[in-house]
UniProtKB/Swiss-Prot annotation:
Catalyzes the deamination of dCTP to dUTP. GO terms for molecular function: dCTP deaminase activity; nucleotide binding. This is dCTP deaminase. It holds the Pfam family DCD. Homotrimer. It comes from Xanthomonas axonopodis pv. citri (strain 306). Belongs to the dCTP deaminase family. One of its GO terms (biological process) is nucleobase-containing small molecule interconversion. The lineage of its organism: Bacteria, Pseudomonadati, Pseudomonadota, Gammaproteobacteria, Lysobacterales. Pathway: Pyrimidine metabolism; dUMP biosynthesis; dUMP from dCTP (dUTP route): step 1/2. InterPro entries: dCTP_deaminase, dUTPase-like_sf, dUTPase_trimeric. Keywords: Hydrolase, Nucleotide metabolism, Nucleotide-binding.
Length: 189
């Protein structure tokens, strides 16, 4: 299994719609020329953006967090260019980009150092072979202060690993519960 380069990522995005919308370069400034957290194709990965759609966790109902019986009322929905995450809390978002993962490829997501150095951790499970959809992102604010996330700017890097053998059973074959997700998706069992 080897990590794939910018050339492979560009080819797969342009010829097979692996990433939509796709940015072949690295964007570091907005339309007004202001610096932003970069996004787009890097040497061996793709830096994704989060959309303006957020779900911020609040425990106003004093519920127990249970992945089998998750209470959607534990979140406040926000649509904004900026999301403020309360201290020691978390928020969910989704990528701007829609992914279609090839059958012989596994994608691993890592947070961007710009956020990590501020105590904001991004968590995403691997994108499995033949999974497709918008990626649901989880941002943990590990600090005792409110933390800010910017929509339409880079938040995480996707690394693409291509196997030397095609898997016997893909995520699509298994009927994965998050196949084709398009919004911020809460836990499913």
């Amino acid at each position: 299994m080897s990590i794939k380069s910018d050339r492979w990522i560009k080819r797969m995005a342009e010829q097979h719609a692996m990433i939509e919308p796709f940015e072949p370069g690295q964007i570091k400034h907005d339309a007004a020329g202001q610096r932003i957290v970069s996004f787009g194709t890097s040497s061996y990965g793709y830096d994704v953006r989060c959309s303006r759609e957020f779900k911020v966790f609040t425990n106003i109902n004093s519920t127990i967090v249970d992945p089998k019986h998750f209470d959607p009322g534990s979140f406040v929905d926000i649509e904004s260019d900026v999301c403020i995450i309360p201290p020691n809390s978390f928020a969910l978002a989704r990528t701007v980009e829609y992914f279609r993962i090839p059958r012989d490829t596994l994608v691993v997501c890592l947070g961007k150092s710009t956020y990590a150095r501020c105590g904001i951790i991004v968590n995403v499970t691997p994108l499995e072979p033949e999974w497709e959809g918008h990626v649901t992102l989880e941002f943990s604010n590990t600090t005792p202060l409110p933390a800010r996330i910017y929509a339409n700017e880079g938040v995480a890097q996707m690394l693409f690993f291509q196997s030397d053998e095609v898997c016997e059973t893909s995520y699509k074959d298994r009927g994965g519960k998050y196949q084709g997700q398009t919004g911020v998706t809460l836990p499913r069992t």
